[in-house]
Amino acid sequence: MRNVILTMIMAGFAMGANAGEMSVAAGIEQAMWGDHRSEANQARNRYRHPVGTLTFFGLEPGMTVIEIWPGGGWYTEVLAPVLNEEGQLIVATWDPSVEGQPNYRYEQPKRMAAKFADAPSVYGRVQTAYYSPPESASLGEAGSADLVLTFRNTHGWFNGGQADDIYAEFARVLKPGGVLGVVQHRAHPGSDPAETAPNGYVSQEAVIALAERAGLVFEAASEVNGNPRDTRDYEEGVWTLPPSLTMGERDREKYTAIGESDRMTLRFRKPAQ
């Protein structure tokens, strides 16, 4: 079945794509079904669309890529093999030296370190940057990254009043001509982030305006992660839906049928000059 899927993807990319793009897509496909991934994470490929998402962002094997706050490392598992030979993946996780953070921010770096140690052939070249703004607010040298990626984090930065500072740091660390790729749970157009971000959603226009304030240029949007079944009106916010399913068994079939959230997928570029 996986071979059939790969053949279909390659056929789609052949319609106007060059050999390099096809090779990148094949590498992503191989990584997302890799033996280093759990069955649960592989099952989410159908919702998170890593081939379409990462090729839209312009991922290339020789890039320096910074992944912001990777959580359990779902996308890290895909990015690390693609970048392993020619590129550099930098995982920006919470800084355990910063006091007063929630407990999970101290546990997550430990889990990631253990994950990397368990599969050195996959993660042996991955670097870690500690990032807990405002106390620990640098992602690296200015102009050092080809691609910065943030998956489903931006609502939290609106909630914490840090969104502008964090996006400004993305712009600073990107090379001229570099790309910021954003995937974020999408609120209804015109909605106020102050009202929707606590439920995990932010409007697309609010994210575009945020990046533009940081000096980045909005280049394109993709509907690869769109989901029209997401009504965004749940008792426990976006976490009502898979994979969290915070309502437990209550209406589980209903929320499972909706699937993961409706997400914007946006590409921004740092001006070359």
Q: What residue ranges belong to the model's regions?
A:
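A short glycine-rich, Lys/Arg-flanked "PGG" loop and its adjoining helix->strand segment in the class I
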Residues: 80-81, 163-176
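A short, conserved alpha-helix within the catalytic core of class I
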Residues: 134, 156-169
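S-adenosyl-L-methionine
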Residues: 104-136
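A short acidic, Gly/Pro-enriched loop at the edge of an enzyme's catalytic core
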Residues: 137-148
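Conserved class I S-adenosyl-L-methionine
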Residues: 62-71
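Class I SAM-dependent methyltransferase Rossmann-like catalytic core
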Residues: 27-56, 60
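C-terminal lobe and adjacent flexible extensions of AdoMet/dcAdoMet transferase-like proteins
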Residues: 253-273
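Conserved beta-strand signature within the Rossmann-like core of class I S-adenosyl-L-methionine
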Residues: 90, 177-185
